[in-house]
Structures are given as structure tokens and as C-alpha cells.
Amino acid sequence: LLFAAGFETTTNLIGNGLISLLRNRDQMQMLRSDPTLGHRAVEEMLRYESSVQLDARTALEETDIAGHHIDAGQVVLTLLGAANRDPDRYQDPDRFDITRTGTQHLSFAAGIHYCLGAPLARLEGEVVFERLLARFPTIDADTTPVWRPSLTLRGLETLQVTVR
């Protein structure tokens, strides 16, 4: 379960993070110049292009949320990717900013459903981007990225790059 659950989402973190850096060269240069921003950069990658976009939960008891009645047993869809771009929560939410603080995104869910692999995924992301940017001074996208069609997961199907 851990291997299957963590593989695709971590792969998506790396691909989504790379395309975010390629589309925001100033942020790539900032991270390259200051590798200590690695943790913040990965948090912003997770917030900005969440690997998991949608999740379903079943209400255990009757409740009201934001004026909407929910019956016990009713399935509720949580739009994690949308929550991570909530303008009431994040200043300028559609801007990719690796210096952003206080992200507290929902990319790994929350509460009893919080992802067990979150610390490992964060570490893998930090190591990948630190090594990638240190080793290759030039990284360029050769083609337009193709996103995998999915309602629940956001990840690239293809992204061809040249590294030098």
C-alpha cells in the first residue's frame, strides 16, 4: 500500500514541481542560488500544483457546513487543489512563490486521513530539486507538457526536457 500510494504522488510532485520552476524561471534561479529554500520550495510546489486534487469522505454524522446541510452517510467531495488556491487563505494564490510562508496546504489531507508518507515525499522532493539544480545549470522544456487526464490526480503524462 505505501509503495503504490507514494509512488505516483511523489512522481507527480517532482514533475509538477519541475514544470512550475520552468514556468517561473525567477523562482528556479532563486532556489538554485539559495538551496536552503528547498523546504519552502517543495511546500509551495505541493500547494501550487497538488498531486491529489480531489478526495471523497463519508460524513459520520449530520452536520451543516457553510450553510449546506450534510446528512450522516452522505459522501462529500473535498477539492484539495482548489483549497490550496483559496484567495481567502493565500495572498496571491495563483502565483508560484517559493518564499511563501505559512502555507499549511492540504496536499497531504488532514486529521486522521493525513498521509503517512508526507515526510518521505517532502524529503524526496527536497533531495531531487537540490541535486537537479546543482548538477545541471541549464534545464529547458523541449515540448509543451501533456497532463494526464484525471479528476483525482494531477500529474504530467509527458514533459521532455534538455539538461546541460
Residues of each region from the PLM?
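Cytochrome P450
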Residues: L1-R164
